[in-house]
Amino acid sequence: MTDLRTEELDFVIPDSCIATQPATPRDSARLMVVPLDGSAVQHRVVRDLPDILHHDDTLVLNHTRVLPARFHTKRHDSGGAVEGLFLQEVNGRWQCFLKAGGRLTPGLKLDWFDGQHLVLDEPAAEGWWVRPEPAGSPEGLLAAGGATPLPPYIRKARKDRAESFADATDRDWYQTVFGDGRAASVAAPTASLHLTPELVQQFNSLRVELEVGAGTFKPVATDRLADHPMHTERCHVPRATLKALPQATRRIAVGTTALRTLESLPSPLPTEDWSAETDLLIMPGHRFRWADGLLTNFHLARSTLLALVAAFTGIDRLRDLYDEAVQEGYRFHSYGDAMLLLPGDHA
C-alpha cells in the first residue's frame, strides 16, 4: 500500500458545485468517462452507458435501501429540540447520534410523535443508546416519524440558497430504483441513484448488499491515511452472485459500497450466501481482485471514498480530474454527477 499523506486528499470545491437536488431524469446526469490507460477523458451523460460499456459487461449493484433515519424530538422536561440520526438497533436498543442545545443525561425522555418517546439509556462509543417507548422496529417507527438522512453539506447548501424540498420528494430522490434489500442504510449508494429501470435492464447485473453507515461521511483526521480508524459496515453477498462472479468478463462496480463489498470477499470464494462486517480501507496500492471498473460520484475532500477512487487513478491524476470537473461545471457529491473509471479498451 502507498503511505498516503492525508493532506494529499485536500482540495477546494466551490460551494456552487455542490448539488442540492439530483438531475431529472436520473440518467440525464453528466458522466466523466476516464480511461485508466491515461487516454483522453470523455464528457457524456449517464444514459450513454449502453454505448460506452461492452454488451457483456456486468454491473455489480448494491441493493440496500435507505432508512428515513433522521428524526426530530423535544425534551420531555423542557421542550428543547433534540435532533437525532439512527445508526443501528441491537437487542431493542437504538444507537443514535443526538444533537441538543443542553446537556443530555441517562433517563431523559424525548417526545417524538403520536405518543412515541425515546428514553436515553447510556452513552455509546459514538452517540447514545436509547430505547423506544412503546417498543417498535426501526423500520416501522422511522417510516412514520423519521426523515431522509441527507448529508449535512446538502442541508447547509439548501439553507444558504434558500431552497426547500418536501421530505417525500427526497425520500424518492435518495432511493435507488432497484433497491429491494433491507432498509438499513443511513446514506444512499449514490452512484446507483443515476440508474433507471431501462438502463439496468440493458446489462447483466449481480446483487450485493452493504448497509451504508454514517461513517461513510467521516473525514480522515489522522496525518497518514493508513492510521485512520475505518468504520465498519455490514455486507451480504448471495450465493448466485458468488457463483457468477468468476465467470463475468468485466465487472463494473456501481458505487464505492459495491466495490468495498466485492473486495472484502474472502479467498477462496464462499460457496453459500456470505455475510460479514467489513472495515476494509482501500487506498492507492490496493490490488483489485473483483472490480475492473467503477461508476462513482464526485466525493468529499479528505474522505476514504476519495482515497478509494485514487486507488484506480493515482492521487495526482485524480486531483487533475477533479480540477477538470470543476472547470467543466460538474455537480458534486451525493446528488451530483458521476465518473466512470474503465480499462483503456472501453471504446
Give the location of each predicted region.
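Surface-exposed, charge/polar-rich loops and edge strands
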Residues: 1-347
